[in-house]
Design a protein with these regions (language model features):
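Multi-pass alpha-helical transporter architecture, strongest
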Residues: 54-56
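Left-handed beta-helix
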Residues: 5, 10-11, 16-17, 22-23, ...
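Surface-exposed acidic, glycine/proline-enriched linker/cap segments
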Residues: 1-3
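Conserved catalytic-core motifs of eukaryotic protein kinase domains, centered on the activation segment
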Residues: 25, 59-61
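Nucleotide-sugar donor-binding patch of glycosyltransferase catalytic domains
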Residues: 51, 62
Length: 62
């Protein structure tokens, strides 16, 4: 049994090649998901995330 929860992608989001965004995840505006990442939790706005599972690498906000 899979999950039918929607994936919500904000504005100006970059999802790089080979990334997987799991069901129920919300990706905030301006976020970047690095190549090959597996996103299992919500991504805050303007965060740069990467890895398996994806973790916050840095924030794009000044």
């Amino acid at each position: 049994g899979g999950t039918d929860a929607p994936i919500i992608i904000g504005d100006d989001v970059w999802i790089c090649y080979g990334s997987t965004v799991c069901a129920g995840v919300t990706v905030g505006d301006g976020a970047i998901i690095a190549a090959g990442s597996v996103v299992t939790k919500d991504v805050p706005p303007y965060a740069v995330v990467g890895g398996v599972p994806a973790k916050i690498i840095k924030s794009r906000q000044e």
